[in-house]
Regions:
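Short, well-structured N-terminal submotif of metal-dependent ribonuclease cores
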Residues: 1-41, 56-64, 140
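Acidic, PIN/NYN-like endoribonuclease modules and their adjacent C-terminal/linker elements
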Residues: 3, 106-140
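Alpha-helix C-capping/helix-to-loop hinge sites
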Residues: 14, 32-36, 52-56, 72-77, ...
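Amphipathic alpha-helical interaction segments
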Residues: 28, 44, 48, 68, ...
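Short beta-strand segments at enzyme active-site cores
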Residues: 41-43, 118
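Glycine/small-residue-rich phosphate/adenosyl-binding loop
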Residues: 46, 50, 58-71
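Active-site neighborhoods of divalent-metal-dependent phosphate/nucleic-acid chemistry enzymes
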Residues: 76-120
């Protein structure tokens, strides 16, 4: 069974009802990953998700509701960063010309065993070692 890693923006759209078409597409993707048991995230994604859902979307969720969402998603395969991951991300910022936080996402995805990363922010179709990026909103 292959693992698929989700970047924060995709998971946010799954719970942001004001995102219209992106909400529907992201929701379908997240639901499929739930049913298949193939979803992977990082601690960074869970942290960013909570902040975004409670502070940055047009209709912010309450902290208790966002906490429940984070707790539910924490049952997926979640990668916690290690010092080695930080060093690998630093190297990736140099080698791949990425921001540090994007590099941390890719390092976590690689460590999760994922070969596919769902993201709106990174370059769809681009590969980084064993991981390929895909934009769920560009495919529709």
């Amino acid at each position: 069974m292959s693992v698929e890693f989700c970047d924060t923006n995709v998971v946010v759209y799954a719970y942001d009802t004001s995102a219209s078409a992106k909400h529907v597409q992201a929701r379908q993707l997240v639901e499929r990953l739930w049913l298949e048991g193939t979803g992977a995230l990082s601690v960074q994604v869970l942290q960013e998700l909570f902040v975004t859902l409670t502070r940055k979307i047009p209709q912010p969720l309450t902290a208790p509701i966002a906490r429940t969402i984070v707790a539910d998603l924490a049952t997926w395969h979640v990668v916690a960063p290690t010092p080695s991951d930080v060093l690998a991300a630093i190297d990736a910022t140099v080698n791949w010309k990425l921001s540090f936080w994007d590099a941390m996402i890719l390092v976590a995805a690689q460590r999760s065993g994922a070969t596919l990363v769902w993201s709106e922010d990174l370059n769809a179709g681009q590969s980084f070692d064993t991981v390929t990026l895909r934009n769920p909103f560009a495919d529709a």
